[in-house]
């Protein structure tokens, strides 16, 4: 016969059954790590009508690079996917031409 358990899964440990839940139950209403509201980021290139991102314009490109030298993601910069590709291409070209560093200067 099958044993019935109330909302708990039984685990086998060294051949003995335990009646503790196997994991924390989900859906208990807790939400962690979610931002409430906040200011919406705007696309800097679209607002300033910048059509071409020049790899030699390091002052502009520095806005989209983190302190450690990584390219910032769209969710942080607020750029569109099209403009994010333009920025990434320009940053990579500037790195090859030694105008921007690949990593931070620690």
From Swiss-Prot:
Q: Which cellular component, as a GO term, is one annotated location?
A: cytosolic small ribosomal subunit
**BP-aspect Gene Ontology terms:** translation
Intrachain S-S bonds: none
Keyword check for RNA-binding: yes
Note the InterPro entries from the entry: Ribosomal_bS18 (IPR001648), Ribosomal_bS18_sf (IPR036870)
Task: Show the GO MF annotations.
Answer: small ribosomal subunit rRNA binding; structural constituent of ribosome
Which keywords belong to this entry?
Ribonucleoprotein, Ribosomal protein, RNA-binding, rRNA-binding
Query: Which residues lie within the region annotated Disordered?
Result: 1-41
Subunit relationships? Part of the 30S ribosomal subunit. Forms a tight heterodimer with protein bS6.
The similarity comment for this entry is: Belongs to the bacterial ribosomal protein bS18 family.
Q: What is known about what this protein does?
A: Binds as a heterodimer with protein bS6 to the central domain of the 16S rRNA, where it helps stabilize the platform of the 30S subunit.
> Could you identify this protein by its name?
Small ribosomal subunit protein bS18
